[in-house]
């Protein structure tokens, strides 16, 4: 299990990356070393991994510049994305409020359009990915794959402290964002308005979990976790011990699906 990583810690690992189409992005690393950070640090490129790649958490925050577009593409690792601020479009769908997107490996998605505000979103993976494979240039590499494409969007409910959010919760309110599937894929928002223990799915029911604090604060394994803090839990580890602070917390759990031969 990784340690809790705060937003402030991640900002110390912030690097600029200009996409091939000229879109400016800024990448803040939370967990692991992603391909942008490797380039920024002058590290050698990594070889491709067979699929599924070995379990290796890679998590970072993307700030996409105003009035920009990231073209359609796919990755070679399973991932979640959490849109947390800004406006634009994901494909043809408006980015409205907090949104979770999941895309399994080799599933093309996007484009991501940012309007004049720009957009911010977390990218969370459980394995190494060498970088985007742009479409349609890399369409040929998808031929012959028998696995069906798999991705989707889930809206995150209003949070504690928001105008439409819960004002008093007895115990813990669990709200489904991505319905649970047989292989363990799921995402659930847990909210409290006071001190309370929070229990999520058993880690070995999937292939790794991320927990992201969206509002308030809590203790995760006796480590302080404030807004925009996160932690990764491996499937062979015990469930994290989470206790909401006295003002409550809104914390999002995202679990990756199991994979054959992993």
For each feature predicted by the language model, list its residue ranges.
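Ligand-binding loop in jelly-roll beta-barrel domains
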Residues: 94-95, 105-134, 183, 224-226, ...
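Structural motif
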Residues: 99, 228-229
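Short, flexible domain-boundary/linker segments around small modular repeats
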Residues: 53-66, 182-197
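The feature marks the first
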Residues: 47-89, 93-98
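Short histidine-centered beta-strand/loop micro-motifs
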Residues: 50-52, 69-75, 91-93, 112-114, ...
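A short, N-terminal "cap"/entry segment at the start of jelly-roll beta-barrel domains
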Residues: 1-54, 132-186
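Glycine- and acidic-residue-biased ligand/ion/polar-headgroup-sensing regions
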Residues: 65, 75-90, 200-221
